[in-house]
Amino acid sequence: MASTSSSQPEKNRSHVPLCRLGTEPVSRTGAAEEPSGQRECYYYAPATSPHHHHHHHHQHHHHHRLKQHHRHHHHHHRLQHHHHHHQQQHNHQNQQMQHHWPSRLGPIGPWLGAMTAYRLLTISLLIGILCPHHVQGADPKFDPTTRMRLVLVPADAQVNSVIYRLRATDEEFDYPLTFEFVGDASASTVKVESLPCTKYNSVCQANIVLQRRLEPGRYYDFQVSVKDTKGGMTTQLCSITATNFTTPHDLIFPHKPGIIMIPEDAKRGTELDYVIARKNPLFQKPVYLELWGSPLFAIRQKIVSSETTEGTVFLLGPLDFEKQAMYHLTILANDAYAEPGQDSRNIAGMEIVVIVQDVQDQPPVFTSAPPVTKLPPGILPGDKILQVHAEDGDKGNPREVRYGLVSENNPFTSFFDINETSGEIFLMRPLEDIAFITHVGDPVLLTVIAEEVKVGRDEPPALASTVQLAFFLPDRTNSPPYFENDHYVSRVDENAPQGTALTFVDPYVPRVYDDDTGKNGVFSLTLLNNNGTFEISPNVAERSAGFLIRVRDNSMLDYEQQQSVQFQILAQELGPATNLSALVNVTVYINDVNDNAPVFEQPAYSVELPENMTAGTKVVQVLATDPDSGLGGKVRYTAILGYLNTSLNLDAETGLITVSTNKHGFDREVMPEYHLYVEARDMDGEGNRAQVPLIIKLIDVNDETPIFDKDLYEFILTHDLMGFTTTAVIHAEDKDATAPNNEVRYEIINGNYDNQFVLDKVTGELTVREKIHLRSKKNAKTRRRRQAGSDDEDTDIFILTARAYDLGVPVRFSTTTIRVYPPESRKRSVKFVVPGHNPDKAKTEETLSALSGGKVYIHNIRPLSPDEPGAKDIPAGNPGIKERSVVTATVIYDSSSVVDISEIQQRLSHHNNSYAIMPQDTSSTDTQYKAENKVLFWLLILLATLVALTILILLLCCICSWCPLYGAATKRIVNISRTEDDVHLVHREMANGKQTKSVQVAEWMGRRDAWSAEKPPDTRTKPTRWEFHDGREQLDEDVGRGQDIGEGDRRHIQSAEEQQRRVRIKHNRTAKDDLHLNFHNSRTNLINDRDVYMEDVIENRDLAGDREHITRTRVNRQEYARRKQYDSEVRHIDDDSMRRHEIDRGSDIDFNTAHNSLKSKRELFIKDGNVEILQLMTRDKTRDGLNLDDDNIYVNVPLKPAGNLSHPQLLMVDNTGKEILMRRFIEEQPDGKQIIREHYQIVPGATYIQSMPNEVQQGSTLKGDTFPLGKSGPNSIVYSQLEPEVKVIHTQPVQAGEGVSLDQQMQPAVSNQSLTHELEHSLKQQNALLRQILMEKEKLENAYTQHEVALETQSLPGQSMAIGTQTDCDAGTQTEGFDGVLDPEISLAKPSRRRARSENDESMSEDGYEYVRFNPPNSPEGVYWIKRRRTKKRPRQPRKRIVMVEEVKRKIRTPIKEEEEVQERKKRVPPKKPLRETKTSILRKQLSDESRKDQSRNGESQTGNRHRSESDSHNRDMFMEITDSMDELASPGSHSIRKIQVEKYYKHSDGDFDEDDTEYSIDSDGDEIVIRTNYPSRAQENERYRRQERTYAEPENPVDRKRPARKSSPTDSQPEAMPRLSRRDSSKRGSRKQTSSEPPHNRVSISKYESTVTENGRKLMSTSTEIVGSKRSLTDRSYQSETELAGLEHEERNVPKYMEWYYNKKKSSVSGRTSTESSKSQPSSKKKVGAAEKRVSKTRITAQPKDVEEYDETGGRYKPEPAPRKSPPKGSRLLKEDRALNKQHKPKIETDTNHPLLQHSEHRFERENALEVPAAPTKLPHYMYPETPPHAAAGGKESKSGRESKTSKEAKPKPSPIRENEVKVSNSKIYVEHRGTGHPTQKQLNASTLEDDHDSGIAMNSLLNSLGRRNPIAEKKSVFSIAYDDVSRVKKINSGGESPQYS
């Protein structure tokens, strides 16, 4: 072994293995070789370093690897050869070892080689022993030469002496090394002292110190270990024994110094002494000396002989005797002499003592010198004051000290003396002398010097010290203060202002003194007898002070009252034992100031004068006085002021007033008295002025004559000649002011010859005394008249003269003439000149009769000749008068003829001619009027026809399945999505309808609505979120009754009550909803839903207040009626179902509480409005979210029943997952179990995706196919493959929009009964729907593998991504606004409280998003989701997924991006999907692209087309909706305008609206919008549509494009979100608050918008419906619906194309919505999602509002949101928070930042960046992933781009609650992705999706908060469930509750 070891070390050196410390440390006892073998160490040993004894050990072991590598070398090669070879092997085979080698080889190698290796060679045993210490990498090693195997120590070894020196090294230089004993056996005998060691040392050493005497012959065993800084440790066994031997100190140290003396001033380097040490004869090494004990000394050694070494001790540093006078030093001799056999110590020690000698270098030190001394009062000169003492500082040889006083610069030295030797100080002069030159209280300073006495010539110079003493003189006697003067005098002006200072002029000096010092010198100054007039400062002074007196109150300074003021100043000492004071008088003389105005003797002067006074008449004399002195008291009268003042004279000196002229103008008849003012001024007319009233009362004079009102009175006698035809009264008036001057009397003075007439003298009435006899006979009179042509009545006329006189003096009178005519004839022949050539005789007679007041008989009519009288009188400016006719007629009057001027005016006006007055040519005038009226009449007819046509078209659209507005399925579903509640109800109700899935979903959503978000435990209830009673909330009602009500009604659910009512309605209408849902859930009954929605829209508008957009449309009225109906229903629902659900969930109470609790529960729930959305984390992403996704068993049963293949795609992702989510959610929620029960009950048919928030989240993630309809609302997460379900989600957003009222409504919906029933019903329906969905999914998978994939991508992305985002990635997507929504949808059983964002995110992530995007926002899932979504498998079908993703997007920006991903996924998926799905996607894409182009002009058409394409069911619903839209869009122009408006609106919303609107339109918006459109007034609807169009058109660029792109794959999902946006945005584009906070309002707006569209031309409805349908289709088509929704809106003008696509799409994926198709397309994920996908489909539809929006956001903006899904708490928080926030600050919440999810950094990040960082795609929905993968890169970029475009618009508007920002962000990002995907709708979807997702989560919360309402969606988790069926409807919900959901 020795040889081996020796060779091995060489090898080791050569190969320098890095001892990878072997398997285990070598035991000390083990043989050296064995330990080395055991230890696998890689040693660095340079070939030259011989000391690596370890290396051979390492070679032996080398971790087996080294062993094997090196072993052969080991044996065959010499050290160096082997070194190279081995090293090479190591390099190749053991790179790890090599890594360590270089570092170790470099430094340690050489050292080891030099020292250790050398010793190893010499002593192989030592080497072996050393090796055993196990080195990990490189453990420290003991120096083999210091191995204490057995140390012999003589028994006389001193205690505390060093008996051995240990050394150790470390190849890795991990110094310092520490030595210590292992165990405590040896602790009492010896101790180990590690010597200082640094990392720069090459060896570390330790001393073994003896602790006690050794017993001879006894063995002491112990173990010593050495550790490096890295923890490597080596131990060695040590043994010592004592020998009976005496240490030969003289042999060891032949010369050793004794005591060394050194002066303290010795210089550095001074040699003190030397020592000689003998070496050990056994060693070759010489002795090595060490000096220990003080750093001031060192030892220098040299070898003087072969046996000895000499060491010289020298000084290193300065010494100071005063500091230390003695040093004990120890000299250690290494390897010193030891007696062989008796002593084997390797070290010997000796001690030396150094004594420092003192040197005279210190001055004296005062030991006694009191610094302060108070001199006693009675001290006299010669008395001793004190004594000082000093000593020499050098204690070694002190010298004597002498004292003295320093007189330099000290005036007091002469007053004192000091004893030179004793230090006593004496007073030399009296204290008074000292006090005379000092200030009182100042100390007397004295400096004393102490100097050493030098007694030898050679001594150092004497040193001196000084000290300063202070003496205080005794206190003086106290004296009082005193003033400079004994009195003071000053002057001040009267009324001097406050603060005026009194000035004292010579000889008065205002100073006060006190000669005392200290406290006795402090005194106060106060004023006595001052009455507060003055104040003095300072109040307190010391020694001396000047004082200042100021005016404080000038009320006493009145010269007129007193000319002077006297007071005293008191100065009083404030000392503790003194009250000495001084008092001085002050007299202040007051200077008079002209401060008084003149005062008149009387307050007013009144005089009575006759009105006829003459010049010079004295009026009055005034007198004023002034108390001021001098000129100030001299008054002049300066002016008379007032009316007629120039008629008076005023004497300036005397004040006499006289009349200045006869024409003075004073007239009693004008006014009874005149008021003037007389002014007086002092200062001789230039100073203060005063005025006094002068009243001149006039005395009336009889200067007025009675005047008759007529100069001639004419009266006609009656036929009986006994009276007059009218009362005959004459009247005269006298203007005099008073009686009797104005009393009038009458008399006849002439003409009353026969005294036949009597005149009453007072009244002036003329009467007949007796029957009058006419003078001439009637015949003659008549004859004469006829012949002369004039009356010969002179003979029959009586002419009287009457006089009127007054009673004044003198009497004044006037006269008048009275003519009395005989009885009048009743016939008269009159010629009338009338306009016209040949007037109609009968009409002319009528007109003339009216004119004349008699009966007119026309004799003849002839033209008027120019020369006839009257011909020239015709006005010149009347061109029509050229032709006139003369009508000769007889006018017969009866006894009383009446002329009605108004009738004449009417007749004339009828002819529109001034000539018509004449009975001339009435025919011409009549003709003109008739013509004008005809034009108006036909215009009205045309308008009525257009209206009827619009209504018919809307009806047809609703009826015809091929119509994108098809109301039965598509539109119905749209309604559902729009009103999440309605949608959910519709799904439930649809259980018996088209498809159990859709119906169940609707019902389920309704139930969800009923239990509202606040009931988090009831997943059903929560997903239902019926509380969104806004138009969006109408989902419940609208789904059930939403088909009837229409989207408008759904949107209309503004208040919680309404929403709850709607929930109830939805329940009531369950059968209808089911039928509709089966048909296409929302879309099937789109018309009905539209009606409902319209109704809702009106109510919502009323509730929201901003629903004006909806009212704008004609549909508004219809919607309003429907809304009222719906509202009443809804209210019932609200009260029972929703309230019960909320109560059960506790959401009504826990609207915010739930949010918190959810948050605490890992923030699994987002509180959206009243809904608590469970933020599901994707399985891979979120702890709960993942489970939730997996657990989201409740895939949205195909919202689109058989009609939508997508529905089957609503795979039950994981029943277990869903249930787990539900359980988790329930556990987390106080009412969790109940919630689950209620949720399941509520949404039996539909997948209980929402049942548990956790489940919901998982559901989203789980289902690639499931569409968490994020759009629906936080809790309305319905995993619907059909977009209609998404509409349900929209319904919740609507509620969110109308959050305040919705929340309230939602709370009522929480009723336990309703909740339980609805939950049970929903569970049943959901189960049925789930089965249907699974069946449909299978069909879709079979028929449309690619389509299914697309559907998966579309529906699942929305749901799965949303869910994933919520839980993980999906949670991120949904986290935004509707994590809860999506999640709830996914796990309907869950109360998808936070589902809105998280779930949407999750769904989106899974389906269409790559997790990439989701990751950044809230969790890795976001990233993955987004990537998945990006997958371009099904660009278009993935869009359907995008619908879900949109929901997710709404929740999280990441989800939006994910939506883009979903788009790409959908693109990828489409291959999987049947061609039809792909085709639909392509159509959508094209439509989207076209929409981008045409959206401005035909946004509505695009929407309609999109809806049409969505699915047959969707088409029907959409057709109905489109019909409505078309009605609204009656004219292309209006449509184009609307489209533009919509697009603009979207843009305005920063894409949020676009997203929302598009989503709303396509998925939920379409239906809901249409319904809402119908519901609100047409104008509102138009407005809404315009907004939508604007949104569509505008977003065309930012949002629509995104949507279109998304449309291809995520677009379907996205449109849903966009329609939501549409709804919300239209209403609140400007105010994103509405969008997010007022889902109802926005929804109403959108609804209005769509309604408007509907009214304008079915186009809007088509747009809405298309959007809805698109949304549904999206679900079916991988979110194509959403994208298409955007696309539809964009392609509104391309409606036909889009509609075709939609129709095709519908055909291809009628059963499954986009998500369903996507699910099929992506069977693997779908199968995983299986049921979940159906659920996803449902959820997708439900979530689509959110999902679409979120998807957009995920894809474009929401993609980042998947991460939010990561944090379900955020989602949950969103639901609660969003509700609360929506209520509180809806606008802000709408902002990305405001969204609760967005508020969470994760959500915001997701929103903004989620696209780029999708969560791990584990949970990615297939539909989402296919398109999402591109999202990872492209999605992220596109999402970002779209998002940036939108974000620039929307992100900048972040203030505008989430909707704008989110829409912008998500739209931009999504748009980019969509563009990449080639889906024009992506942008729109993004906007909508963003908004929708926002609505679901953040937006919804924001909207609700801003509205102060609960987030309808958030409140209605059930709504989300339903939403999956009615994706469009969910979208529409967004319009009402969009903001909350998506924003």
Swiss-Prot record:
Q: What is this protein called?
A: Cadherin-86C
Its GO CC terms are: plasma membrane; subapical complex
The residue ranges flagged as biased composition, category Acidic residues, are 1552-1568
Which residues point to the Extracellular side? 1-934
Composition-biased stretches (Basic residues) = 50-89, 1426-1442
Q: Where is this region: Disordered?
A: 1-102, 1038-1058, 1390-1442, 1458-1516, 1546-1695, 1707-1895
List the GO molecular function terms: calcium ion binding
- Per the UniProt record, the source organism is Drosophila melanogaster (Fruit fly)
Polar residues: which segments have biased composition? 1633-1667, 1879-1889
Ranges of Low complexity composition bias in the record: 90-100, 1709-1724
This entry's comment on induction and repression of expression is:
By hedgehog (hh) and dpp signal transduction in the morphogenetic furrow.
Q: Which GO terms describe its biological process?
A: calcium-dependent cell-cell adhesion via plasma membrane cell adhesion molecules; cell-cell adhesion; cell-cell adhesion mediated by cadherin; homophilic cell adhesion via plasma membrane adhesion molecules; regulation of cell shape
Tell me the membrane topology, using the record's own terms: Single-pass type I membrane protein
What's the record's remark on domains? Answer: Three calcium ions are usually bound at the interface of each cadherin domain and rigidify the connections, imparting a strong curvature to the full-length ectodomain.
Q: Outline which residue ranges sit on the Cytoplasmic face.
A: 956-1943
- Gene name for this UniProt entry: Cad86C
